[in-house]
């Protein structure tokens, strides 16, 4: 039996511990854009999301954090998110947290459909936001994989990114 040696270095901080790769998914887009993992904002632009887009703004907010993830993923689908989540080739990728950028005015209905789909996935989480004054009734009983934010949003993108 071998002894285990542990070296503790108080000068060097531990690395960043992450919770997986956040995915910024634009639903109901005019043009689909393939799943791309990005380490910085220039890679988000290369993936097809201009600096004026909601997707870019969410990515910028994520990368501005003190303990930002090493990488994020971006993607756009012409379908609703719940439909996109039904394809195992999309859910089998390395992302873990889902942030949806939408052009749909029926946000609460979309949130309900996405919640229902994500709850069937073992290793995914959904971060959703609704306006603080939203009167939509959402069933939250038995929900384990969805985090809802109710807030007064003055921005064009999901508050959970911040």
Each predicted region: which residue ranges?
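Surface-exposed assembly/interface segments
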Residues: 1-162
